[in-house]
Amino acid sequence: MTQVAVLAGGVGAARLLRGLVDVVPPEGVTAIVNTGDDMVLHGLAICPDIDTVTYTLADAIDPERGWGLRDESWHAMEALSRYGGATWFRLGDRDLATHLYRTQRLAEGQGLAAVTAEIAAAWGLALRIVPATEQPLRTMITLAENEGGAAVIGVGVAAGQEISFQDYFVRLQHAVAVSGVRFAGAEAAQPAPGVLAAIAGAEVVVVAPSNPIVSIGPVMAVPGIRDAVAARRDDVVAVSPLVGGKALKGPADRLLRELGHADSVVGVARLYAPFAGTLVIDEADAELAEDVRAAGLRCVVTDTIMRDPAAAAALCEVVLGR
């Protein structure tokens, strides 16, 4: 059975995984998922990237938003707003059940990897979904001055302030400039059970078309993971999240630029060169293929836009070298 390990985070990774399980047996697929976005809110353990992967693979994701469950209701949020509670991070009524269950199982002493496996099994998934780490790891964003140079960016938010990823991405709608990113807790983190074995045993290690800074970055910040991936460099295939120099979703292109990297597939190539042997780029960036190769990677040009599961499956065939 073909064994594939996928470093994953966000909607792009979820869509790639949806295509991958159509071209290889899902039992041979391990998704190693970013936990830097995780948070505790209303006393609940929330793992947005893990849940997006789970819901997408279960064909239960809301197709319009790209997160949460299809046909969701919002009665709990409406009731919470009456009390003046925090409703900027929207949690649907059925989605709440996932967070309630996860929080209860963690409180009972189960590790996040085991709980994630339980949730995936409950959705009928055959692939393995594992967190990058079970220890607290939080992506923290330092804000830069806005375009007008003003120090105060918004209510309670100022240049130089460090905020959580969800505050940046959801509450502020990533509409602010960034001067730094760090992964709090990374130095004390360890790869979750099964992560290193999945990387070592995979025929192909795939870096999904996720944000290089805030989706792949936290995974690679866990001690041991970057070295394990680099040891497989010839078998590591990364998919660029940029098309024509732009992110299809989210702030990947802006973050690259704001943090001093080229906001193109060349910038992605330079970030990934130490641990990836091949970069798959979109046809819109074909003129940069030689620059990618100059950065030390093989370059494959194809259609990387996953408009539907069939397009995602076709991309995965290319990623697997078929």
Locate predicted features:
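Extreme N-terminal starter segment of soluble prokaryotic enzymes
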Residues: 1-4
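Short Gly/Thr/Asp-enriched flexible loops that form oxyanion-binding sites at enzyme active sites
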Residues: 17-21, 215-228, 289, 293
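A short helix->loop->beta-strand "cap" motif at the edges of active sites that frequently abuts
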Residues: 25-27, 232-236, 297
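Short internal beta-strands
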Residues: 30-34, 234-242, 278-283
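Electropositive, gly/pro-rich neighborhoods at or near active sites that engage anionic ligands
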Residues: 33-183
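Active-site glycine-rich loop that binds ribose-phosphate moieties when present
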Residues: 179-199
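Redox- and metal-dependent alpha/beta enzyme cores, enriched for Fe-S-associated oxidoreductases
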Residues: 220-259
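C-terminal functional extensions of proteins
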Residues: 249-322
